[in-house]
């Protein structure tokens, strides 16, 4: 390359950096976008490969990943992670993000991932590298990138989940490439666990105290606290006692926690230590201060909130009993496409929250995004039902469909409210026997409708035993809320065999998606702690899952229902030619 061409090339690179810098208000001077992979070098490993092997490589997952993931990664999202000071240009962000996605796609450990990056040409090809080993980075560089990503998300909890933003951009691309319809969606939640060990209340108490003790300089500790530094003391403390002594042992830990917190009084640098803050939180959640005794007394087991601390190492994890099983960790809520004509289905939205968050709360938070995606019909189970959420969904242009309902079912030996003629759900017009009420009323404040009927007529009515009216001294009366009318309306739709069959069929496969995330991508038990890290990892795992679905599309593994649907309209089956 001549001198003039080299100068021109460097001038273009510098202008590219300056353009990005000006776009972000001079926020970064040394961020460099990695687009060199778009121009192939004349001499590279691919050019020296046997044509048959090169053709096979072009048809492999690596080529799909490069085209539909790596080339679609928006590096500009990650500009705020880098300092504006002059310094060495960043290692390519799209390579780091690509590596994270491949890690969860292939279920690699970090050690295996780095080896594959160094010596596996498919991995290099997927990351836009055409010569094996052409880009080296120290292991520490990858860990520092993860640390920046985590800390930035921690400091901007409401606006800065960069992995989620990347998920949204890639999802939009996947939908466009596969020609997916998003008009129908299904939703389900599942329980996931962070990298913590399940233990009883006493084990938790010991771990909290031991972490707090280790966080203090040994010179501050007295003999009663120093013993918790011994490696073999935990076994003696937890297991060498009778069942009847457990509560007194918990009280002993409570007393030690009080003692430890007194040692750090007046020392802000120690009080601000996360381990000490965990001790303070544990004390307030697990004990009550009795002023008369001037002492912290351990609470009974039933007095402990489900939002209380569950692990000394993960302050965000919560407890929930669901489906007869005990869960510690988080809830993951998924929204997935489910239109019959779609060749494959992908996850279009997700949310991770404390597992004490109800399905209704998560659905309510997802409605704006569902509307943005163009969802018109949403299929869920009964855990997502409430009259208010149905109204809220309708306000977003979404019709709810339920496979079942939670709560108490109406008595089967009583006439349904729908057998009464009710005008606008505010006024009783006729009873099932076609009798008009003496008077009817609607209370707008509480949404209760009432109607009074003639006692003589009701006494002679053949439907007396199954009617919902209550007999009084001078008349009969019926009270019903608008919520009850709405609920009954939904229940009647569910009991319609055809509608229920369709709804169940539409929703059922999302259970398989949950299973795939847990089995194929190890989402059931994550290797990180804290809701922020769990959210970043879950985002990478769901992108990996969606890419698997996209790969199925390109391989012609089309859903049977989609084949029938496309055949009906004579559209054929979409098969990629690239």
Name each model feature, range by range.
Residues 113-126:
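DNA-recognition alpha helix
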Residues 59-98:
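Basic, short loop/linker segments at the boundary and entry of helix-turn-helix/winged-helix-like folds
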Residues 2-69, 464-467, 471-488, 492, ...:
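Charged, often Cys/His-bearing segments associated with DNA-binding zinc-finger transcription factors
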Residues 86-90, 104, 321, 534:
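Short, solvent-exposed segments of well-ordered alpha helices
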Residues 95-107:
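Alpha-helical support elements that line or immediately flank enzyme active sites
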Residues 109-112, 131, 135, 143-578:
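Anion-binding and metal-coordination hotspots
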Residues 77-83, 125-132:
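Short amphipathic helix-turn modules centered on a small-residue break
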């Amino acid at each position: 390359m001549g001198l003039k061409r080299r100068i021109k090339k460097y001038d273009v690179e510098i202008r590219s950096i300056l353009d990005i810098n000006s776009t972000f208000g001079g926020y970064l001077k040394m961020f460099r976008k990695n687009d060199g992979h778009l121009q192939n070098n004349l001499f590279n490993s691919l050019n020296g490969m046997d044509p048959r092997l090169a053709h096979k490589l072009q048809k492999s997952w690596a080529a799909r990943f490069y085209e539909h993931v790596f080339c679609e990664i928006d590096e500009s999202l990650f500009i705020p992670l880098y300092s504006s000071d002059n310094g060495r240009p960043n290692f390519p962000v799209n390579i780091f993000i690509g590596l994270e996605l491949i890690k969860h796609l292939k279920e690699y450990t970090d050690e295996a991932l780095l080896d594959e990056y160094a010596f596996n040409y498919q991995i290099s090809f997927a990351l836009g590298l055409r010569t094996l080993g052409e880009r080296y980075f120290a292991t520490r560089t990858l860990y520092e990138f993860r640390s920046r990503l985590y800390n930035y998300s921690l400091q901007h909890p409401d606006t800065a989940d960069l992995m989620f933003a990347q998920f949204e951009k890639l999802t939009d691309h996947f939908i466009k490439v596969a020609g997916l319809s998003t008009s129908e969606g299904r939703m389900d939640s599942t329980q996931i666990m962070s990298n913590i060990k399940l233990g009883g209340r006493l084990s938790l108490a010991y771990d909290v105290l031991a972490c707090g003790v280790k966080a203090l300089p040994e010179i501050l500790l007295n003999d009663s606290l120093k013993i918790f530094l011994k490696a073999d003391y935990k076994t003696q403390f937890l297991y060498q006692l009778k069942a009847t002594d457990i509560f007194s042992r918990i009280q002993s830990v409570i007393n030690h926690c009080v003692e430890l917190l007194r040692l750090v009084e007046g020392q802000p640098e120690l009080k601000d230590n996360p381990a000490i803050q965990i001790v303070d939180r544990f004390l307030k959640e697990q004990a009550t201060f009795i002023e008369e005794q001037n002492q912290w007394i351990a609470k009974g087991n039933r007095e402990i909130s489900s939002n209380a601390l569950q692990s000394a190492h993960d302050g965000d994890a919560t407890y929930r009993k669901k489906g007869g099983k005990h869960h510690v960790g988080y809830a993951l809520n998924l929204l997935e496409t489910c239109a019959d004509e779609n060749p494959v289905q992908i996850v279009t939205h997700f949310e991770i929250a404390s597992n004490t968050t109800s399905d209704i709360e998560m659905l309510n938070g997802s409605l704006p995004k569902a509307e943005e995606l163009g969802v018109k019909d949403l299929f869920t189970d009964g855990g997502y039902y409430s009259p208010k959420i149905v109204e809220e969904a309708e306000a977003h242009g979404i019709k709810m469909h339920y496979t079942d309902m939670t709560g108490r079912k109406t008595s089967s030996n009583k006439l349904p409210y729908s057998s009464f003629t009710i005008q606008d759900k505010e006024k009783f017009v006729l009873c099932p026997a076609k009798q008009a009420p003496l008077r009817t009323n609607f209370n707008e404040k509480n949404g209760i409708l009432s109607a009074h009927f003639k006692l003589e007529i009701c006494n002679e009515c053949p439907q007396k035993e199954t009617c919902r009216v209550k007999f009084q001294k001078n008349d009969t009366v019926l009270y019903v809320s608008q919520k009850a009318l709405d609920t009954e309306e939904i229940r009647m739709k569910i009991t319609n065999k055809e509608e229920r069959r369709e709804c169940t069929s539409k929703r059922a496969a999302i259970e398989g998606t949950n299973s795939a995330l847990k089995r194929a991508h190890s989402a059931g038990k994550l290797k990180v702690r804290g809701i922020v890290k769990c959210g970043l990892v879950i985002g990478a795992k769901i992108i990996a899952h969606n890419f698997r679905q996209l790969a199925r599309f390109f391989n012609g593994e089309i859903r049977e229902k989609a084949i029938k649907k496309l055949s009906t309209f004579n559209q054929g089956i979409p098969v990629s030619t690239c």
